[in-house]
């Protein structure tokens, strides 16, 4: 599993790591975050430090054609915090965002 935000929070340059590891990536955690490895916060997928459309283009350009899962979604208004990071409304928001980017990236190819 390649958790892009984890690599980023460790200080890695994703735009160098993904091409280097492309043939070893079997599953992507599509996740965004902000901060540092010792003081970070989960963000909405469209509101962190990572350029999510650019990352999807990079996966495509490197031949990474694997399952992608939205991961660590923020809890949205009206949700309980029973399953923090994996609640339904935040996940639906993230899936819609991912789907929109994927459609755009596919049209560019």
What kind of region is each of these model predictions?
Residues 1-109:
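Histidine-acidic metal/acid-base catalytic patches
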């Amino acid at each position: 599993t390649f958790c892009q935000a984890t690599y980023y929070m460790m200080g890695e340059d994703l735009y160098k790591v993904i091409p280097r590891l492309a043939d070893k990536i079997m599953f992507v955690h599509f996740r965004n975050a902000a901060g540092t490895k010792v003081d970070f916060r989960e963000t909405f997928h469209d509101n962190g430090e990572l350029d999510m459309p650019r990352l999807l283009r990079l996966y495509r350009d490197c031949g990474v054609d694997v399952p992608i899962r939205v991961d660590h979604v923020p809890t949205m208004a009206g949700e309980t915090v029973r399953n923090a990071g994996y609640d339904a409304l935040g996940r639906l928001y993230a899936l819609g965002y991912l789907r929109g980017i994927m459609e755009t990236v596919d049209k560019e190819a």
